[in-house]
Amino acid sequence: MNLFLKGMSTFSTRAVYIIYGFFASVLFINYFSDTQKYNYVILLTGVLLLSIVGSFILRKGSLYLEKLNEKKCFFVLVIVCLAVKLTWVLSYQIQPLVDYATFYYTAEELSESFVINKRYIALFPHIFGYASVLSIFLKIFGSSYMIPPILNVILTTISMGLIYAISRKIGGVKTAITASVLWIALPSQTMYNMFALSEPLYCTVLLLIWMIMIIVHEKIANINIKRLLVYSILIAALLAFMNMVRPIAAVPIIALVIWFFIIDIKQIGNKKIWLNKITYVGVIVVGYLIFSSAINQYITLRLGEEIASTPGYNIYVGFNEESSGKWNKPDAELLFYYSDKPGWTADDAQQKMLEEAKERVQSGNIDFVKLFSDKFFSFLGDDSSAVDYAGPILDNIVRYTVASNMFYYFLIATSILGVLVAIKNKNKSSLFIICLFAIGLTMAQLLVEVASRYHYSATISMVILAAFGINHAFNKKENIDINEKA
């Protein structure tokens, strides 16, 4: 039995890395197989130069910086991150647009009144999550279009610090430095900071959750029950909060269960570790459900009406083959048709949309292979959505589009290096859960409404995998075996 579990662990580990490598390779081949693409030569040349010359500079640079005072190096990275992100949002200022306007103006209302009457928010309660946090700052500093960008810059800088800490545990100081530089240089992330959007907030919380998970993983064999419960409750609260902002908490929870019980098998023959793991995950799940219920009650109180409990509309749109699973007017009109019915609550409308979604899925008229393929490429195939949103104020849209996709595919290429190293060394460290998150997010997105900007959190996985690959793929003298490290 023990031999079977060990074999299953190794097989599952490699399978996850192979799936990521397959997804990334398909993206790369699909993107560059279109030789008629505008600026194709510039894009291909840029990605190749970044992958070869850029990786070399990052590897040698991080090796040099590793020998310096680490605290000073980290401090410089924080200052550079803050400076780069802040310079951009101060140079390119834009009023809230489309979905981002909904976030901002909802936050304004929440800063002025405890209860607001907005059926749209009751239909999509996650909007309340970010808007409620933003409303605190609007209440303190007053209404200003610049508060969301400044808040985003601060959150982005905190994220860099967490990326550094996580990457350091996975691959050492060199990997941490490289990951930080990649995060600082990521064009789309820098541009997204201009808007009132939830991604910087929920990704900072996600990184904090990962960091705590890694700490618990390191101590699981000897941790006392009180500290274990504190960590479990803290993670549960953070997951519930993150889900309030962006409903994706199921992905890291499932990833944690797979990592702790299938991949990491220290519990074999050790009853204490078994008990600690079961207690840890059990308290997280139960705590998450309790905190989520309390949060939903609070949102209902602030909106003055029952909120939707199911994403029926998002699933319905996700299976619209004609729109390739993206937003479309007819589906939106159907939702509001039900929502506007006399006596119907937001939850009634979403429950009805869930029924409509089931009928659509079971109709027999959907080519699922084509639909999922289209959604996969819509979700991950391009990284220039931020440019599209910022188009009205950018001086050269083509330049920023090329830069965004060039760097994005450089990340994809080098993240493939990272998973190849992980496959070779059967890496079962926290790198696994970060890789699995990207896969889980992608699979989840295939079931609901899709948009390119939703892959924002997946770029964090790419950054860490890329940094790992850049620093460890060509180390001939180093036999990387950090399976128990993080």
Where in this protein do the model-derived segments appear?
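Extracytoplasmic catalytic/substrate-binding loops of multi-pass membrane glycan-assembly enzymes
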Residues: 92-106, 112-136, 142-146, 306-308, ...
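Short helix- or helix-capping micro-motifs
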Residues: 81-84, 179-185, 239, 243
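Membrane-interface anchor segments at the N-terminal boundary of transmembrane helices
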Residues: 34-48, 147, 371-444
